[in-house]
Structures are given as structure tokens and as C-alpha cells.
């Protein structure tokens, strides 16, 4: 899980290798030697301090944890609380750069949309980027996070190469459960 990293500004880089297994050493070497560009994205948010987390103060002494954060866990909490973080959910660094353009949203029936964009590797090294699609409720009938990840796709690109990414979004992708309405 995410931890405090008060020393994070001291090194020139931090390489996060989740569950690398027996191939983790070779993968780390290829990344550090520049043979492969990093392309992972964080699956969690790293706070600046423990006090910045949604669960701070909810773990009193003893064996009982108080889960009071509800839907505001992880990036949903930090977005809603507008808290600064050390490393945000869904972000990661690369040895190359990417440029997005051509965003289009097209209705495909009553409850389906196609969301497209182009992504170009604008840097000098081959690399991969996780294109992420977030949605927000305009007029929710109950509290909702400011945005939620609803789709993503990893795209591998050579320098100068451009690809189109297309997401099929359904009305159900915006659904949430209402405990009061039991639906």
C-alpha cells in the first residue's frame, strides 16, 4: 500500500516495482540501463503525510478498525478533498513524452458513446502510455467523487508514431448503487 515517503525529494529517481517476482531483477536492470522505458501507472495515491489520508484517525488503539471513509478512498478522496499528494493515482514517468489530441465523443445509440483520441510518441525513445478515461457525474442524486476512472488502454508507440485509442462507453459505466433506494 501507499506509505509516507518524506525522503522522496532526495534521490534523482524512484523506481516502483510492484510484485516483480523472479523476473523483477532483470526488469529493473533493463529500466535502469535505459533498454526499456518505464510505462507503469500507479494503482494508488501516495500521500504527503499519514495525516493526509482518508483513514487518518480511524485506527484507534486496539484491534477494531473504523471504516468511515465510504466511497472516498484512494484518489476519490484526494480529488474530493483537493489535497496535494506526493504521487497521484494513474500517473508514472517515462523516458519519452506523449502528445494527446483529436478528442471526439460520438453517440452510438441511446445508451452508448464512442470516445476517441489520438496519442503520439513525441519523444526520442520507444515507450508505452496508459490512456485513461475519467467520468464525472454532473447532477448526482447522492454524493459522488469528482471523477472516476471508467476505462484505460495501454498503447505502445515508437518515436514519432501516432495511434488512435477508442473507448466504448455505456450508460452502465456511469451507474452507482444507492443504499437508500436499494438499486
Regions found by a protein language model. Name each.
Residues 177-183:
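Glycine/proline-rich low-complexity spacer/linker segments in large multi-domain proteins
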Residues 1-128, 134, 159, 179:
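Secreted, periplasmic, or luminal enzymes acting at the cell surface/secretory milieu
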Residues 141-177:
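Intrinsically disordered, low-complexity Pro/Gly/Ser/Thr-rich segments with frequent PxxP/GP/PP motifs
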Residues 124-141, 147-149:
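Short acidic, flexible loop segments centered on an aromatic residue
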Residues 135-137, 169-171, 181:
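A short beta-strand motif that forms part of the nucleic acid-binding face
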Residues 65-66, 138, 150-152, 182:
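Short, intrinsically disordered/low-complexity patches at protein termini
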